[in-house]
A protein has these predicted regions:
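ATP/NTP-dependent adenylation/nucleotidyl-transfer catalytic domains that generate, transfer
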Residues: 88-190
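ATP-dependent adenylation/nucleotidyltransferase module used to activate substrates
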Residues: 1-101, 110-123
Length: 190
């Protein structure tokens, strides 16, 4: 995947910032061995930390990620199955900046993985199609598969579910979190 990104940035003369997790003392294979379970959650937290740190150090006002509709629906389903009100209160295509945290946006939230892959193919953009080598047994893969099957039988259901959550569910969870939730703040050691 890294090679694909490097070639894309070189072709279009985009600057590329690479953070090597092993050099930071957090090599993902080592973290995986210590966890002895699917690493997705820990890997995501590690990446979010370094994305945010890089944005702040670089003076970037917004951090954009490539999360798409499939990612968002799988995450929403996972958070709903656990009734994780903290995550449900801030899930969405945009998260404002706050004390020590860069503003985050997900410009592809309306687009599926399939649509993105088709666009890349039609435009001649090299794409990396292989799943993460550590994702075996991860719940997100299972949830994405379930949503693909549901979408096949009920077209438009992914967007209906996610958009409905943004309009009705998220405000309810935000209200509940404001009343009883913890305030997100930067780590005092970091």
């Amino acid at each position: 995947a890294r090679g694909v990104v490097e070639r894309f940035c070189q072709k279009y003369d985009f600057p590329l910032i690479v953070r090597d997790m092993a050099a930071e003392g957090l090599a993902i294979p080592d973290v995986k061995r210590k966890l002895k379970r699917p690493i997705c959650s820990a890997c995501g937290k590690i990446k979010r930390y370094f994305f945010n740190q890089t944005a702040k150090e670089g003076g970037f006002t917004v951090l954009a990620t490539g999360h798409n509709l499939d990612d968002e629906v799988a995450r929403l389903t996972s958070n709903t199955l656990r009734w994780d009100s903290a995550y449900l209160s801030d899930q969405g295509p945009m998260l404002d900046d706050s004390d020590g945290f860069a503003k985050k946006v997900k410009p592809f939230w309306r687009v599926t993985e399939f649509e993105t892959a088709n666009y890349a193919f039609l435009m001649g953009i090299e794409n990396h199609y292989a799943p993460c080598p550590y994702s075996t047994g991860a719940s997100f893969s299972t949830l994405k598969s379930l949503w693909l099957e549901l979408e096949d039988k009920m077209p438009g259901r992914k967007m209906d579910f996610y958009h409905g959550f943004l309009e009705r569910g998220k405000p309810a969870f935000q209200s509940a979190e404001q009343q009883e939730g913890d305030v997100l703040s930067p780590c005092t050691r970091c």
